[in-house]
Amino acid sequence: MEFFDPHSDPKPGWVKAPTADGLLMDSHGDRIFGRYLSPALYKEGERRPVVIMCHGMPGQEQNIDLAQALRRAGCFVIYFWYRGVWGSHGNYSFSHQIEDVHTVVDYVRSGKTGLPIDTDEIYLFGHSMGGFASLNALATGLKVKKVFLLAPCNICYRQLFEKEKLAGLTKTKDSGYYKLERYTILEDELNEHEQDWYFPNLVERLPREIPYTILCGLQDTVCPGDTHVKPMLEKMQANGFDVTYMEYDDGHSFHASRLWLASTVLKAFQER
């Protein structure tokens, strides 16, 4: 499949111009909001891959520049907001975040978007807690073609080994970003799932037939790759997974390397 330069505007001659619009999706009885970006289409009846983007916690970084770059490269892109945050209905929780990834992928695969998406080419991108949700969704039966994890957050590492850092949950809960069923829901979920959500323990449940690309920042003090990713990575490598691990000299959100990041994400989806 042909991809295009993510750093150049679409070349003339399309049969359908790039466009964008909002999405409303039902997730377990609540409406969640999303948005799609449609690439320029150059052939009648053409279907293109789709990248589904999962944001972190609480989600100030939406990686919209990456979404636009992937759209310019020829992909449909869908980004969305989990239940209980950024206007989506319902209550926020870690388990709801995982369920909502399933919801969006199922929505796309069902054809309900009405877009000419190649549903055999669904790619998943997860940043930080979006990486947590992506991995846990994959471990509970989610089917996609390729996965890119940017600085994924193994929050159960903190639950098991750095409980003092979980005090930040109280601060974020008090920020007003989340609508919660009860004030202690996040701590309660971590106590219940500290073993089954812990990244190394996911490996035996992850699909082995798809390629994984994981990128961590050498200056990341939020979710350092050495502690959050490498124990899982070693187990994946020992069990024959198709996994590529990269490190780059940047922080948790890669603010200093956005153009390089866009090219790297596209290359992973294009070549693997």
Positions of PLM-derived features:
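Catalytic nucleophile-loop/oxyanion-hole region of alpha/beta-hydrolase
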Residues: 58, 63, 83-119
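The conserved beta1-alpha1 loop
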Residues: 54-56, 216-217
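Conserved alpha/beta-hydrolase
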Residues: 70-89
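N-terminal cap/lid segment of alpha/beta-hydrolase-fold proteins
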Residues: 1-45
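Active-site glycine-rich loops that stabilize anionic/oxyanionic intermediates
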Residues: 48, 55-59
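The alpha/beta-hydrolase serine catalytic core
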Residues: 10-12, 144-233, 238-239, 255-263, ...
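Primarily recognizes the serine-hydrolase "nucleophile elbow" in alpha/beta-hydrolase
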Residues: 107-168
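Histidine-bearing beta->alpha loop at or near hydrolase active sites
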Residues: 84, 245-255
